[in-house]
Each structure stands twice: as structure tokens, then as C-alpha cells.
């Protein structure tokens, strides 16, 4: 028997465009967008700064324009990094200030969103939904195995800020030695920062993918329970 897996996956893929009927927490939604945008800008500006730093000496690109560009990218990094790290603090303060209201609003938002998603999956049979749920379940452990034990957005931003500082010091006429603790220690610190940045970015990717699959499985499993109990 051929199940309509492709149809179900298309329906699931379209769920991202669904929006709950009531936007009960617009401030949190906007803060989340600000955090995502600031992270993307921070990563892009860091890689541009890294390119300028790598070409600054060996390729004789030293000029006022290069230095001003590097300095501008550094300040953009600092501003975006501080913005990214500040959003969770603002969210926490807002949550504590109106704890009951935030909990209720979050619950209403989640239930309303889940109901729309479940409604879109109800036309499919129990066998089809169970099959897709099992397919997702099989893939979840594989993604979990690729995740590191630590690392995420905050560690990525902190490592970017440290590496950006070392980059601007090099562009300003210094060297990698003497930026933090001196000589070999600085090279080790920079290497560790690059490793932290790499693991953090990989962790963010795989955890986002894992969270997405877990949410899909939860919605499909809820749909299965509803079909079994009420149809």
C-alpha cells in the first residue's frame, strides 16, 4: 500500500505559513525577529571583517578605506552582539512582570496554532499519519547524535565578539600575539574561539532541525489521538 507521504509532507511544509487567528504576544514576536536579524548581521559582518583581516597584510590592501571598513564592521558586530544577548533579558523581565498573563497568552497562541495544523492533517488516514510519525521518529536520534553537548547562539555571539576584537587589533597594526595573554596563549585562545564558533553554529543548525521534527511529530501524534478518539 502506498501512503500519501508526499502529500502529508507538503501539508506539513505549508504549516510554516500558517498563523494563529490571534497574535497574543506581538512584543515577544518582534523581539524574536530582532534577535534573528541581529544574529545574521553579526555573522555576516564577522566574516566580512575576517576577509579584510586576512587580506590586509599579505595582499597589501592597507588603506584608510580598509581600516574604516574594518572598524565599521567591528562596531556593527558589537552592536548586533549586544542586541542579541539583550533580547532574552528583556523577554525574561517582561515575563516576570506579567507572569500569569504571559503564561495564558503563550498557551492560547500554542493551542490556536496547533488546532490549525491538526485541522490540515485530519483528511489523512490513521495509517498514513502513523507511517509519517514513525518516519520522523527514526530520523530524530540520527540528528541528536550530530548535536554537540554544548553551544548555541549565545556562545556563537561571544566567540564572534572575541574574534572580532582580535581581528580589529591586527588591522590596527598589531599581531595576534599580545591581544589577550600574549604569544602562544593568544593563538590558542583564537583557535579555541574558532572551534567554539564552529560547534555553536553546527549546534544551532542541528538543534533547529531537531526541534522542527519534534514539533511536527507532536502535531501528527495529536492528530492521530484525535482521529482515534473522536472519529
From Swiss-Prot:
Coiled-coil segments on the chain, per record: none
Protein species of origin: Escherichia coli (strain K12)
TM stretches of this protein: 39-59, 70-90, 156-176, 189-206
Protein name per the record: Uncharacterized protein YuaM
Lineage top rank: taxon: Bacteria
Stated family: Belongs to the FliR/MopE/SpaR family.
Subcellular location: Cell membrane
Its membrane topology: Multi-pass membrane protein
GO CC annotation, single: plasma membrane
Keyword annotations from UniProtKB, A to Z: Cell membrane, Membrane, Plasmid, Transmembrane, Transmembrane helix
Record-annotated disulphide pairs: none
Amino acid at each position: 500500500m502506498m501512503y500519501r507521504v508526499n502529500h502529508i509532507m507538503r501539508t506539513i511544509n505549508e504549516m510554516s505559513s500558517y498563523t494563529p487567528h490571534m497574535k497574543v504576544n506581538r512584543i515577544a514576536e518582534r523581539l524574536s525577529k530582532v534577535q534573528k536579524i541581529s544574529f545574521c548581521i553579526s555573522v555576516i559582518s564577522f566574516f566580512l571583517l575576517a576577509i579584510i583581516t586576512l587580506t590586509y597584510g599579505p595582499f597589501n590592501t592597507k588603506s584608510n578605506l580598509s581600516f574604516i571598513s574594518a572598524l565599521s564592521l567591528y562596531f556593527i558586530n558589537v552592536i548586533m552582539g549586544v542586541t542579541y544577548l539583550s533580547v532574552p533579558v528583556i523577554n525574561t523581565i517582561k515575563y516576570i512582570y506579567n507572569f500569569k498573563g504571559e503564561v495564558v497568552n503563550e498557551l492560547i497562541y500554542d493551542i490556536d496554532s496547533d488546532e490549525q495544523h491538526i485541522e490540515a492533517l485530519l483528511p489523512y488516514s490513521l495509517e498514513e499519519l502513523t507511517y509519517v510519525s514513525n518516519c520522523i521518529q527514526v530520523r530524530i536520534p540520527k540528528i541528536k547524535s550530530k548535536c554537540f553537548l554544548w553551544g548555541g547562539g549565545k556562545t556563537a555571539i561571544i566567540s564572534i565578539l572575541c574574534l572580532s576584537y582580535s581581528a580589529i587589533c591586527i588591522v590596527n597594526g598589531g599581531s595576534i600575539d599580545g591581544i589577550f595573554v600574549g604569544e602562544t596563549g593568544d593563538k590558542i585562545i583564537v583557535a579555541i574561539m574558532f572551534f567554539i564558533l564552529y560547534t555553536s553554529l553546527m549546534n544551532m543548525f542541528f538543534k533547529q532541525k531537531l526541534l522542527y521534527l519534534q514539533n511536527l511529530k507532536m502535531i501528527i501524534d495529536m492528530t492521530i489521538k484525535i482521529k482515534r478518539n473522536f472519529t
